[in-house]
Design a protein with these regions (language model features):
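N-acyltransferase acceptor-side catalytic subdomain
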Residues: 1-170
Length: 170
């Protein structure tokens, strides 16, 4: 798998259609993960929530096929640490996640963490991924991979979004 860091949305424009197509098959298909939504969110830096942020979207390809997208940015988090956060964090968007098919999640996370540790080693001290859905398989995969690396993994509930489960025939 070949990983690439994108620091501008212009470099991602050619992937816009593939991004949204993959989202439809992804572990989490939420409107807050659509290409245009995250591009527009980035243009306003989350409505001004992150004035000192730098884009750090990572894509992974294999044989010219898009395998996964980590829609990230770099900023100092609320604890004062340099961190990689999910685009859309924290107050504006609910239900953020990686964009990857379920079958590719484990190997994508493993390769992503290798890539981030080797390509951006001085740019972050934390992966501060808020607004992940409680049922997201990213949580278990990330915990397993970080544990295997000897990294600290912390999971907390942060202002859960309300929802109402509707019957299938609604």
């Amino acid at each position: 798998m070949e990983f690439k860091l994108h620091t501008t949305f212009e470099s991602l424009e050619p992937l816009a259609r593939a991004w949204d197509d993959m989202l439809a098959e992804s572990i989490t298909d939420a409107p807050f993960l659509r290409f245009n939504y995250l591009r527009d969110w980035w243009q306003t830096l989350g409505g001004g929530e992150w004035p000192q942020a730098e884009l750090a979207v990572v894509t992974a390809h294999e044989a010219d096929a898009l395998i996964g997208i980590a829609p990230l940015f770099q900023a100092v988090n609320q604890d004062g640490l340099p961190a990689l956060l999910l685009l859309g964090s924290i107050e504006i968007s609910d239900y953020l996640d990686l964009i990857v098919r379920p079958a590719d999640l484990t190997r994508f996370i493993n390769g992503l963490l290798d890539f981030l540790a080797s390509s951006l080693p001085d740019s972050w001290r934390a992966l501060d991924w808020v607004n992940l859905p409680e049922a997201s398989p990213t949580l278990a995969a990330l915990e397993a991979d970080t544990s295997a690396r000897g990294w600290t993994f912390t999971r907390e509930t942060y202002q859960p979004a309300p929802y109402i489960a509707l019957p299938a025939d609604f």
